[in-house]
């Protein structure tokens, strides 16, 4: 077997070749290629004339000697037009009911059925067996069919509670396409002279029958790690608890997991990674409402849980809370304490300065910086006599902010523990302390916990960096996940600097 990274590079080059000349269809081509390489089915929803059939035709060129069949369904379509006409000779000579399948669906590797919901019951029932079992009953015999990819298309969804739901459930990947939006792409499409029937894929990139068969075995060997399963189960529980969530059958979940295994395999990995789960957004929706719902739920999962983002923020919150507790304990020890000397008949208590505050001017440190008079303040200088007068009689108290300029009025009080507390305009307060008494260093316990958390964050970010090279995931998702991880990292760094 080819080296995993060489295989991933080859599939990437194959996809690029298939995408050539198709504008704003890269994601659709890549997911259809993934479906073809893993033997799954795709439903394309969108208005007429947006290259749905061309996407299917292109996928034929991914394989060596692949045969294609396409058909536009109508209400009057018959099984003979899809599965082949009856053999008059066999019926006449031998009385056998047998179809001539050459050139029809039973002998095609790539199948495109347009306006699929207009098919009648006879076609739908046979098609269900073909998709489920890859078998076709031709008269008295069961014939194995080589179909690797079924692409069904329509400009509408099947009606709810109709006989079409069984077939719709078999279409694992569902893509909602629209017209070309970008101006430059629209112009390029208009002036393109590329022949749609040309094969854009070099022979060296095309997949042989032997490779395809071997890859089916290799895909099944890709492991599903426990942490990834837990994410999938979390998503399943979230959907089960939402009132408007689509019903997802166990069969659909199982087929979706195989698609995730294929994504991992063709990305050069031996195990499903959280990044692969983004593919579920194209597998689990039913209509426009559930499509938006799946996008929202997967974004919550990817940006909050897949790389432990929310768990790390919860841990950080606990560390910060513990730090505040330790700071409060330290604050009680280092805060500047005055002496209460209120008499028995005094209307209000009055205080005196402690013996260590004997200088004519006192500089007291804020245990936490505050913004006072539009200035970030870390210490205040008081005239000792003015401070003594305020402690005895109350009234206005002034101090020089950071020891400079004129003395400014302060909102200051003595709390129940006999500590001086200064408050800003929003009434947030901090205690004052003598220089040398305040402990500025971070407690060793907190420092160690933050370092451990930062190391865990680096490991998660490294995991994401190693896994993000996935051809089948749109770059927009990678940007959102990276932003969520960077936000967690920034909050950790801010906590370390406080």
Curated annotation (Swiss-Prot):
It catalyses: ATP + H2O = ADP + phosphate + H(+). InterPro entries: AAA+_ATPase (IPR003593), ATPase_RavA (IPR023671), ATPase_RavA_C (IPR022547), MoxR (IPR045427), P-loop_NTPase (IPR027417), RavA-like_AAA_lid (IPR041538), RavA_ATPases (IPR050513), RavA_LARA_dom (IPR046898). Keywords: ATP-binding, Chaperone, Cytoplasm, Hydrolase, Nucleotide-binding. CDD domains: AAA. GO terms for molecular function: ATP binding; ATP hydrolysis activity. Disulfide bonds: none annotated. Signal peptide: none annotated. It is found in: Cytoplasm. Its main location: cytoplasm. One of its GO terms (cellular component) is cytoplasm. ATPase activity is stimulated by ViaA. ADP binds at residues 23, 49-54, 196. Its EC number is 3.6.1.-. Belongs to the RavA family. Component of the RavA-ViaA chaperone complex, which may act on the membrane to optimize the function of some of the respiratory chains. RavA functions as an ATPase. Homohexamer. Interacts with ViaA. This is Regulatory ATPase RavA. It comes from Salmonella gallinarum (strain 287/91 / NCTC 13346). The lineage of its organism: Bacteria, Pseudomonadati, Pseudomonadota, Gammaproteobacteria, Enterobacterales. The gene is ravA.
């Amino acid at each position: 077997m080819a080296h995993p990274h060489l295989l991933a590079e080859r599939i990437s080059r194959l996809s690029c070749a298939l995408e050539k000349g198709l504008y704003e269809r890269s994601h659709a081509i890549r997911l259809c290629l993934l479906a073809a390489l893993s033997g799954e089915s795709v439903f394309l929803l969108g208005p007429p004339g947006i290259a749905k059939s061309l996407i299917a035709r292109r996928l034929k060129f991914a394989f060596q000697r692949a045969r294609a069949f396409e058909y536009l369904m109508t209400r009057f379509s018959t099984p003979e037009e899809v599965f082949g006409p009856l053999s008059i000779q066999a019926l006449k000579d031998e009385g056998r009911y047998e179809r001539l399948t050459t050139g029809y669906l039973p002998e095609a590797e790539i199948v495109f059925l347009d306006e699929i919901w207009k098919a009648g019951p006879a076609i739908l029932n046979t098609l269900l067996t073909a998709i489920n079992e890859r078998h076709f009953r031709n008269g008295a015999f069961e014939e194995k069919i080589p179909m690797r990819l079924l692409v069904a298309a329509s400009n509408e969804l099947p009606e709810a509670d109709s006989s079409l739901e069984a077939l719709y459930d078999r279409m694992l990947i569902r893509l909602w396409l629209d017209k070309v939006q970008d101006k430059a792409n629209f112009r390029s499409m208009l002036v393109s002279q590329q022949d749609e029937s040309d094969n854009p894929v070099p022979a060296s990139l095309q997949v042989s029958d032997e490779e395809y068969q071997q890859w089916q075995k290799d895909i099944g060997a890709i492991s599903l790690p426990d942490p990834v399963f837990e994410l999938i189960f979390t998503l399943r529980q979230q959907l089960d608890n939402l009132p408007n969530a689509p019903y997802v059958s166990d069969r659909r979940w199982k087929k979706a997991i195989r698609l995730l295994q294929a994504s991992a395999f063709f990305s050069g990995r031996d195990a499903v990674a959280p990044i692969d789960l983004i593919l579920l957004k194209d597998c689990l929706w039913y209509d426009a409402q559930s499509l938006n719902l799946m996008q929202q739920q997967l974004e919550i999962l990817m940006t909050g849980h897949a790389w432990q983002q929310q768990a790390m923020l919860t841990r950080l919150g606990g560390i910060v809370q513990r730090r505040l507790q330790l700071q409060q304990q330290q604050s009680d020890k280092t805060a500047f304490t005055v002496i209460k000397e209120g008499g028995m008949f005094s209307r209000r208590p009055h205080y005196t300065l402690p013996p260590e505050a004997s200088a004519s001017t006192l500089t007291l440190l804020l245990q936490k910086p505050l913004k006072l008079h539009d200035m970030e303040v870390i210490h205040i200088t008081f005239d000792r006599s003015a401070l003594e007068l305020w402690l005895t009689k109350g009234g206005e108290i002034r101090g020089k902010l950071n020891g400079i300029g004129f003395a400014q009025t302060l909102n200051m009080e003595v709390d129940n523990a006999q500590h001086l507390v200064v408050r800003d305009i929003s009434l947030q307060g901090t205690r004052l302390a003598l220089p040398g008494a305040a402990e500025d260093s971070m407690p060793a316990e907190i420092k160690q916990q933050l370092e451990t958390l930062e190391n865990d964050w680096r490991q998660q970010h490294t995991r994401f960096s190693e896994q993000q090279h996935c051809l089948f995931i749109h770059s927009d998702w990678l940007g959102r996940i990276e932003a969520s991880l960077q936000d967690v990292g920034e909050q950790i760094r801010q906590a370390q600097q406080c």
